[in-house]
C-alpha cells in the first residue's frame, strides 16, 4: 500500500511487483487493462524521444552514463569479426554505440525498439557518429522477437524492461534468441537499499523530476509515469528469480549508486 510522506507518494517494497510478475496491469501507479498498457507506454516515448538523454539525466542525476559504461565493460564485447548483439528497447543507440566502439568496430548490433520515434533518433545519431555500418534498426516487440532461435552472442536491455507489459515473455524471448553460451544483461532502475538515499531519491523523483520535465519538455505526465514505473518494478532479488525462471544460469546482479539502478546478468548454458 502506498504511504503518504508529505506530498511524496512513496511506494513501499510491498507494492512492487514480485517474481511472479504483474507489470502488465500497471501504468505507473494506475491499474490498467493489459491490452491498454503498450499503447500508453508508446505514447510516452513518442513524446520524450527527442529529449530522451535529458530524461535519463533527470532520472539518474546524470549517472546513467557511468552505469551504461559499466554495463558494456561487464559485457566485454568480443573484438572478433562476426560477434553479434541484440540491444532491445535500445532506440536511441546509447548501449549499441558503446558496444561497437568497445569492440573496435568489429561487433554488429541489432537495435530493436517498439517505438519508431526512438529508432529515428538512434538512426540519426548513428549516422552522425559514423557507426551506421555496424548497426541494424528493427521496429518490433520485445515479447515477439522476429529472429530465429540461437541468433545472437549477447542480449542487452537498458531502462526498457520495466516498460514491457509481460516481462516473463520478454525474458523467454531473450533466452530463445541467444546462442548457447550467450549472455543476457539488463540495466534497470531498482530498489534503493540505503535508507537515507532512499528518502532523498524519493524526494527528487516525485517532487523534482516531473516539474523539471515540464519546464524542459512541457510534459510532466510522462515523467510522472516513468518515476512511478520504477517504484512498481520488481526488486533486485525478485527480478533475478524471474531471469532464472526463463532458463538462464549463473544469474547475478550488481547495484549501482546504492541500488538506484541494478545490472542483472545471466547466461544461456
Swiss-Prot record:
EC number(s) from the headed UniProt entry: 2.1.1.163, 2.1.1.201
First-level EC class: transferase
GO molecular function, one term: 2-methoxy-6-polyprenyl-1,4-benzoquinol methyltransferase activity
InterPro entries: SAM-dependent_MTases_sf, UbiE/COQ5_MeTrFase, UbiE/COQ5_MeTrFase_CS
Domain of life according to the entry: Bacteria
Catalytic activity, as annotated: a 2-demethylmenaquinol + S-adenosyl-L-methionine = a menaquinol + S-adenosyl-L-homocysteine + H(+); a 2-methoxy-6-(all-trans-polyprenyl)benzene-1,4-diol + S-adenosyl-L-methionine = a 5-methoxy-2-methyl-3-(all-trans-polyprenyl)benzene-1,4-diol + S-adenosyl-L-homocysteine + H(+)
Keyword Metal-binding appears in the UniProt entry: no
Keyword terms of this UniProt record: Menaquinone biosynthesis, Methyltransferase, S-adenosyl-L-methionine, Transferase, Ubiquinone biosynthesis
Family assignment from sequence similarity: Belongs to the class I-like SAM-binding methyltransferase superfamily. MenG/UbiE family.
HAMAP family in alphabetical order: MenG_UbiE_methyltr
Full protein name: Ubiquinone/menaquinone biosynthesis C-methyltransferase UbiE
Organism whose genome encodes this protein: Brucella canis (strain ATCC 23365 / NCTC 10854 / RM-666)
Amino acid at each position: 500500500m502506498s504511504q503518504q510522506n508529505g506530498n511524496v507518494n512513496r511506494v513501499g517494497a510491498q507494492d512492487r511487483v514480485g517474481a511472479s510478475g504483474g507489470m502488465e496491469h500497471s501504468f505507473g501507479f494506475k491499474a490498467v487493462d493489459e491490452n491498454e498498457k503498450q499503447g500508453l507506454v508508446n505514447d510516452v516515448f513518442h513524446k520524450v524521444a527527442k529529449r530522451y538523454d535529458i530524461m535519463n539525466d533527470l532520472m539518474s542525476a546524470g549517472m546513467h552514463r557511468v552505469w551504461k559504461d559499466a554495463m558494456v565493460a561487464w559485457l566485454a564485447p568480443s573484438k572478433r569479426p562476426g560477434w553479434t548483439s541484440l540491444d532491445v528497447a535500445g532506440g536511441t543507440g546509447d548501449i549499441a554505440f558503446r558496444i561497437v566502439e568497445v569492440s573496435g568496430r568489429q561487433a554488429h548490433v541489432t537495435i530493436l525498439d517498439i517505438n519508431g520515434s526512438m529508432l529515428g533518433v538512434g538512426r540519426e545519431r548513428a549516422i552522425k557518429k559514423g557507426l551506421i555500418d555496424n548497426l541494424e534498426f528493427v521496429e518490433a516487440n520485445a515479447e515477439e522477437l522476429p529472429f530465429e532461435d540461437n541468433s545472437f552472442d549477447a542480449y542487452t536491455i537498458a531502462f526498457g524492461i520495466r516498460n514491457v507489459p509481460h516481462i516473463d515473455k520478454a525474458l523467454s524471448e531473450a533466452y530463445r534468441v541467444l546462442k548457447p553460451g550467450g549472455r543476457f544483461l539488463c540495466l534497470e532502475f531498482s530498489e534503493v537499499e540505503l535508507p537515507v538515499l532512499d528518502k532523498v531519491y524519493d524526494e527528487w523523483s516525485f517532487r523534482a523530476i516531473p516539474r523539471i520535465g515540464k519546464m524542459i519538455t512541457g510534459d510532466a505526465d510522462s515523467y510522472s509515469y516513468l518515476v512511478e514505473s520504477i517504484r512498481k518494478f520488481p526488486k533486485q532479488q525478485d527480478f533475478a528469480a524471474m531471469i532464472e525462471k526463463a532458463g538462464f544460469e549463473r544469474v547475478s546482479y550488481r547495484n549501482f549508486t546504492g541500488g538506484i539502478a541494478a545490472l542483472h546478468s545471466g547466461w544461456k548454458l
